[in-house]
């Protein structure tokens, strides 16, 4: 133990040579939003994950990433049409629930091949998911019904071979190419100009923090928004584009602390935090 402590004490912190960095990552680095945030938050963690490609052993089951994919699928397919609206343009709850159930069944059939061969645990899990997914869809529908913005694109890709080119930045002589997807793009035409907002569904607990943006993290939605302003004219009917903002929407049915006297408005405000 003493020998190991002496060895550790004699070690010095160094850095990789430029030749080693080029050999490891190349001179053109393709970055996703999560990779960019990982690099800004901890260089060593980035090196271990994306340089050494070390991975933790994953447990079998329907984990958070799979749940996020499932919810994104439901939201995308529900809001590709306007059939959930009532005659006044508001939310028809019965139509919305029926459409949500239909999309969930489609996901189970097309993405999972049905549940007949799955474990009883997974079948039970999907039965339990229906109620919270309905609540998530209802929350998104009510936000849309109160807005002049309408969905005009879903899962919009940035990168080679996708809907729009990647976001490219030059850093220390290297070209960083950022690729990824925007969950939803909403548009509103006013005075002949197209106002765009990008929508990010939050299935986890991560929230938007302006301090992160100041420190170079959590920039992806803003980068995508300004890339849409620059590159999206031909994609959206030739309108001149104005960036209207970034909207982070909770895509989970959170359990909140409350009381019997809590109003519906107060409950929704707590859920949206």
Language model: regions and residue ranges:
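Structural signature of nuclease core domains in nucleic-acid processing machines
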Residues: 1-273
């Amino acid at each position: 133990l003493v020998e190991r402590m002496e060895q550790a004490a004699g070690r010095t912190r160094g850095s990789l040579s430029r030749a080693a960095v080029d050999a490891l990552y190349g001179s053109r680095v393709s970055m996703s939003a999560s990779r960019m945030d990982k690099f800004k938050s901890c260089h060593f963690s980035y090196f271990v994950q994306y340089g050494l490609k070390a991975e933790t052993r994953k447990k079998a089951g329907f984990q958070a990433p799979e749940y996020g994919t499932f919810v994104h699928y439901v939201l995308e397919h529900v809001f590709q049409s306007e059939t959930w609206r009532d005659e006044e343009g508001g939310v028809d709850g019965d139509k919305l629930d029926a459409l949500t159930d239909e999309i969930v069944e489609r996901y189970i059939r097309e993405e999972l091949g049905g549940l007949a061969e799955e474990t009883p645990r997974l079948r039970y899990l999907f039965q339990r998911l229906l109620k919270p997914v309905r609540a998530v869809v209802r929350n998104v529908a009510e936000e849309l019904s109160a807005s002049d913005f309408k969905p005009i694109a879903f899962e919009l890709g940035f990168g080679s071979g996708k809907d729009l080119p990647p976001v490219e930045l030059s850093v220390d002589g290297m070209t960083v190419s950022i690729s990824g997807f925007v969950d939803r793009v909403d548009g509103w035409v006013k005075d002949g100009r197209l106002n765009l907002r990008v929508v990010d569904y939050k299935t986890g607990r991560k929230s938007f923090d302006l301090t992160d943006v100041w420190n170079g993290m959590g920039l992806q939605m803003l980068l995508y928004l300004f890339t849409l302003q620059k590159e999206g004219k031909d994609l959206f009917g030739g309108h001149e584009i104005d960036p209207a903002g970034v909207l982070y929407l909770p895509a989970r049915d959170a359990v909140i602390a409350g009381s019997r006297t809590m109003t519906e408005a107060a409950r929704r405000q707590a859920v949206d935090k």
